[in-house]
Amino acid sequence: MLSALPAPLLGLIASTLMLLNILFWVPILLAVSIIKLLLPFKHVRLWIDPLLLRIAEAWIAGNSGWMRLTQKLDWDVTGMESLSPRQWYLVVCNHQSWVDILVLQHVFNRRIPLLKFFLKKELIWVPIMGLAWWALEFPFMRRRSEAYLRQHPEERGQDAATTRAACEKYALVPTSVMNFLEGTRFTAAKHKRQQSPYQHLLKPKAGGITLALDAMGEKFGAVLDVTISYPDGRPSFLQFLQGHVRQVRVHVRTLPVPRLPNDADQTEAARRELCQNWVNQLWQDKDQLLSSYATKTRG
């Protein structure tokens, strides 16, 4: 256990181990992806996609390994019963830090299918990682503002098309579609700017989850409502690497999949409103849970 080392040295060791793990697994991932690209047939995809997922799971296991070696973490995880790697899941979570991604991958690795995150388009240019996300078919979203779309109406619907295309692929092999419904990491400044009605959360957005339900609603076996809390305060990624995070709380709530009406009388706006109301209730429950965590921490 290296957690007793000085923070700068610990951060250097953790960063190095993380980078070595990336440099080992990503080239393997890309090599297999190129084969799939050169042989774009369904039966090839049905063989290669599970192989890509096994490679990604091994990569995540490597991350869990260096985390165990360098971090003295107390994991308080609840609600993991009855999960299956052979089921399709829609996963939603609050978003506080880049550390959330490592936490989610560590907790769910090989317990459910690989988490597929919806990413900002700009992230495809991140060295090495952008290629890895592309190889794993994470959808890249433009996330244009409403003001921009009013000026460029020809771009309206591009994210919807990207989501539908991704979900069509995910329907072939068990997948966990992951969505941070707030769309960005929580900060006090964003919370104030939004005038969020929640104490610990930003306002959730239902657009992406509505599209996923439209495309794959019949495939999803359950919704996993995940709440992450850091009793020591929201950490930066560097603070995590340097060992400043001592405890992580993760609560998983398994919920039935909401069934949106698909009759012709329901407009897209009406369907999105129904989903938004459902999401708002999720967020109200999540905010109450985070408040109870905060009370325990102060106590």
Please place each PLM-identified region on the residue numbering.
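A cross-family acyltransferase "interaction/gating" segment
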Residues: 124-144, 172-265
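Conserved glycosyltransferase catalytic-site signature
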Residues: 101, 164, 205-209
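A Trp-anchored, charged/polar loop motif used as the substrate-binding/catalytic surface
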Residues: 155-168
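Accessory terminal regions of nucleic-acid processing enzymes
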Residues: 19, 262-299
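Membrane-anchoring hydrophobic helices of lipid-metabolizing enzymes
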Residues: 1-89, 95, 103
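Short His-Asn-centered micro-motif
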Residues: 79, 92-95, 119-121, 180-182, ...
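Catalytic core of membrane glycerolipid acyltransferases/transacylases, capturing the structured
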Residues: 42-46, 51-58, 85-152
